[in-house]
């Protein structure tokens, strides 16, 4: 399974862009393989994201906003959930990945 981060490359909202960048930078820094899925370039991907975000995570009005994070077809969460997992040091669990153990250097 690959981590998929649904983003909007042409979002006019600075807050959304910053959240997307935060997720992508974290994954890159931790060498977690992921795929960016730009919902502004594919109506099919946008509809897939809207359909697969659980009802309890959908806003009362409108559609879910990026970034939305999936592990394959399994929904992981939105930015707020990602941020909470980052703060509590549980990102690997949030993403449905096995935690990596830091390797000790041999003396």
From Swiss-Prot:
InterPro entries reported for this sequence: Glut_rich_SH3-bd (IPR006993), SH3BGR (IPR051033), Thioredoxin-like_sf (IPR036249)
Protein name in the entry: SH3 domain-binding glutamic acid-rich-like protein 2
Motif placement: SH3-binding: 61-67
Natural source organism: Pongo abelii (Sumatran orangutan)
Entry-linked PANTHER family: SH3 DOMAIN-BINDING GLUTAMIC ACID-RICH-LIKE PROTEIN, SH3 DOMAIN-BINDING GLUTAMIC ACID-RICH-LIKE PROTEIN 2
GO molecular function, one term: SH3 domain binding
Gene Ontology annotations for the cellular component aspect, listed alphabetically: cytoplasm; nucleus
Keyword Nucleus: yes
Subcellular location: Nucleus
